[in-house]
Amino acid sequence: MTFMQANKKRTGWIGTLLLLIFHTGMAQSPTNTPLAPMSLTAKEAVDYALANQATVRNAKLDELIQLAKNKEVSGMALPQLSGAGSFQHNPIVQKQLIDASNFSDTVPKGTLVPFAFGLKFNVLGEVKFSQVLFDPSVLVALQARKTLEELSHRGVQKAEIDVKVNVYKSYYNVLSARKALTILRGNLTTLEKLLGETRETYKNGLVEKLDVDRLVVQLTNLRTEEIKLQNLSEVGLAALKYSMGMPMKQELTLTDTLSLAEIKSAVAVEKFDYSQRIEYQLLESQKKAYEYDLKRYKYNALPILSLFGTGGVSRASDVFNYFDNQTWYGYVGYGVNLSFNIFTGFQRKRKVDQAFLQVKKTEVSIEDAKLGIDLEQTQSTSNLRNNIVALEAQESNMQLAQEVYNTTQIKYKEGVGSSVEMSNAENDLLTAQNNYFTALYNASVSRIDYLKAYGKL
């Protein structure tokens, strides 16, 4: 592929990305048009966020800025052409004293006379040309373009991964709260029915008022818990919309479900390389950028060679008659410039030292990142395994608590069970349900952390 073909391809890609960002921004502009309801899976919510979330959009704009800077650097190696023009009016022309005896033997030495070395009206038009033949700083800047593009692109990838983590966790948080709310409302329906039956039984004198009061207290507690879960669900949904870059007024339905089977679907990673982690990739790219800095300071000892050329026309007179057909005087000049540093007070050496140490510092950061990744993988693997075990246990425990509650309810209706047993069974069921949903959310979050730790998100 030629340079021109690559440039056209890149320009087309930039235009497409700009159009996408512009379209996204327009789509989010405030409008009076009602927003159509949306139904999204967790994956679709992530895709929406990658197109609309402000952090990702800014990262993409930063990438475009870097591409524009790279084109600016490319322009430094191209010919530079500039033009200038001036008009000057001298109502009083500056005079200088000269010895008139230099121009005539008849004039006594030391005879000073004023003499004007200019005219009242002066016009100048000039064009300047320059071309770098060799400049070490320009050479290194051209070589570093690809690395800087890579660095900015990986910044976009890092932003996308962070957004994915936030969206997935927010999505599953809402699902967990809503699932808990659904089961709680089922408990409310059952308890309301039981309270109605108990009141009828109380009217017939078969149970005490204390039994009715206990059920009323339980019902009130459940309704209070329902309000809390409803608020948690609404706030969680608002947080999800924010993490997606979605307007708060947008009606959103979550279509995914939370299940143990889905959480277990996180496939064990058989082979892992640190380059799969975006944080490691960013540090590697940053190291390359610092190495180019080091190279630039080293090359500053080399000379700078460039071509230059100047051409122009001028005219001067004591009368403003530039529209008359009179002679303009042209001039042309060209040459080569060569410059180099002989002694800079050891400044270049100190800059080289600093750049070298910066490279070493990045190498230390890379080694530390490897250790951090190892720790993160160990923790995430252990957390996922333990949370799956806890979820399985809590799921069985909740089912058992439900069976105990159902049996206790039957005994209570048949008059062979007490209200105390009923209250205890209700509390045990609520505790088991809360523990289950906590375990469900923890397992879902640990799955996301596990995938992120292995660069699979």
Model-derived features with residue positions:
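Short segments within alpha-helical structural elements
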Residues: 224-246, 399-456
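Outer-membrane beta-barrel architecture
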Residues: 71, 128, 293-296, 337-339
